[in-house]
Structures are given as structure tokens and as C-alpha cells.
């Protein structure tokens, strides 16, 4: 960052079904840590991480929104002022991909098109993986950024947030 250049701040929301790993992904990204203990997010939890993109630096304000499998109960008001979002699905539970797809439709209807990345989390559990490559390929063909991730090992986490940081700071 050059002297006198203002620090960019961008609000990023974490969205996905119940128990897909949103909080663990944030913890991995912000603290480079993972905990086996499961804690349910109530409402929203906010964290911050500074990302150096070379030509600029951005503070990502991460809003970890409580996961719901019934998307009608997800509070879209949390997304006000959001520059982009991370959709999270659990690769061992295909129904959570359906929740993520529905959440994206709802976000677009309520807030317009925003940059996003879809993380298929729990990639370390390959023997239990249940989302087919055809579904993933179809989403990529539709222009989606789809990445495998593991909050436990850190696989794909940093790259996904960095990609989103680049996209939300790009000139519109």
C-alpha cells in the first residue's frame, strides 16, 4: 500500500446451511486455526482480516451469519452493505448444496448481483464425499467460482478469500 492511500474495507458475508463449516473457515482464514469443538453461531459473528493484494491492501470484515437449512429464516438484512459473499456447502451432505443454491437466488433477488465464491467444504473427508463432479462442472459452466476447501487442513481457504478480495476491490 502506498503512503496516503486509504485502506479499503469490504464487508463479506458467510452464507450456507447449518453445520457446513462457515465459522471454521473464518477461524482458519483469520487465525490459521481449527477446532474440533462445534459451536453454533447465533445471529452473526464478525471478524476482520487484512489482505495484501500487492497493489492495494483491503480489510475484509467477515460476517459469519448463522446457518439455516430453511432459507426463509436467514436474515437478509445482515447482507446490507455487503460487497460480496462466500457460499459454503458441505461436500459430504448434498442437501447443503441445494441450500447454497437457494441462498444465492435469494441474495440476488434481494441485493442484486454481488461477487461470490462457492466453497465445497470438508474436502478432507474424501471417503464421505457426496457431491458429484457433474454438479460442480455445471456450476462452473454457468460462470460460478467453485472451490474445494477444508477448514481442518486449510486447503483452498486462503485462495478463496484472496480471490473474493480481488473481485470485490476490482473497478466496477
Regions of interest found by a model, annotated:
Residues 1-172:
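TRAFAC-class small GTPase G-domain
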